[in-house]
UniProtKB/Swiss-Prot annotation:
SUPFAM superfamilies: Family A G protein-coupled receptor-like. Keywords: Cell membrane, Chromophore, Membrane, Photoreceptor protein, Receptor, Retinal protein, Sensory transduction, Signal, Transmembrane, Transmembrane helix, Transport. The record marks 98 as: Primary proton acceptor. The record marks 106 as: Responsible for spectral tuning. The modification N6-(retinylidene)lysine is found at residue 232. Belongs to the archaeal/bacterial/fungal opsin family. It holds the Pfam family Bac_rhodopsin. Changing residue 58 to A: Reduced GPR photoactivity by about 30%. The record marks 109 as: Primary proton donor. It comes from Unknown prokaryotic organism. Residues 19-29, 88-90, 145-147, 209-218 are extracellular. GO terms for cellular component: plasma membrane. This is Green-light absorbing proteorhodopsin.
């Protein structure tokens, strides 16, 4: 039934997916990146939901969340690519709506992967959720012109650093130390994505809003699209890999 609903949902989405494009210029690399990421997100969503049948019960929720992350992003990318191709404007509102839903889910994955293998306090999830929301809210305020770009950038980066601390040296790391080697390996890899993969976002913000006349919506969106590809899809694949390994050893 789950697979049937997934296929049905994909079929329903296809007309909208096909209609929101217009002509794509071969030299518009940002537009091409929108299309590539959209297709990759859909493929990843199908993959994660189908692969739920391969893992044990305690890992199914993690794969479900991975599928939700890529599925929600796919839906918003259908609209974002349309805005870009038709107007050439940065789809800031659509992008932040997407991030407001998917970034807390990505953060939730850290809690879920630890909860599946060891005991972890619920306070960790609350801290990470607050940190992610602060990062997103101030990022949006800076991009939307609600507040000055530099202060918003600094506050957002501080929230990101706070989350890294909690995961690298705080409650998250303490819980990870009691998990299996496979879970620890996955956790550490996810940490590197949070540190280096998420660093792509402030690079995009800086390029688009803090470089004066040198900034451009083209560079901003190309960088953001790359970041979403890495952080949403690769993140989920790491979860899938450890889930399959742990399930086969059970």
């Amino acid at each position: 039934m789950g697979k049937l609903l997934l296929i049905l949902g994909s079929v329903i989405a296809l007309p909208t997916f096909a209609a929101g494009g217009g002509d794509l210029d071969a030299s518009d690399y940002t537009g091409v990146s929108f299309w590539l990421v959209t297709a990759a997100l859909l493929a990843s969503t199908v993959f994660f939901f189908v692969e739920r049948d391969r893992v044990s019960a305690k890992w199914k929720t993690s794969l479900t969340v991975s599928g939700l992350v890529t599925g929600i992003a796919f839906w918003h990318y259908m609209y974002m690519r349309g805005v870009w191709i038709e107007t050439g404007d940065s789809p800031t509102v659509f992008r932040y709506i997407d991030w407001l839903l998917t970034v807390p889910l990505l953060i939730c994955e850290f809690y879920l992967i630890l909860a599946a293998a060891t005991n972890v306090a619920g306070s960790l999830f609350k801290k990470l959720l607050v940190g992610s929301l602060v990062m997103l809210v101030f990022g949006y305020m800076g991009e939307a012109g609600i507040m000055a770009a530099w202060p918003a950038f600094i506050i957002g980066c501080l929230a990101w650093v706070y989350m890294i601390y909690e995961l690298w040296a705080g409650e998250g790391k303490s819980a990870c130390n009691t998990a299996s080697p496979a879970v620890q390996s996955a956790y550490n890899t996810m940490m590197y994505i949070i540190i280096f993969g998420w660093a792509i976002y402030p690079v995009g913000y800086f390029t688009g809003y803090l470089m004066g006349d040198g900034g451009s919506a083209l560079n901003l969106n190309l960088i953001y699209n790359l970041a979403d590809f890495v952080n949403k899809i690769l993140f989920g694949l790491i979860i899938w890999n450890v889930a399959v390994k742990e399930s086969s050893n059970a």
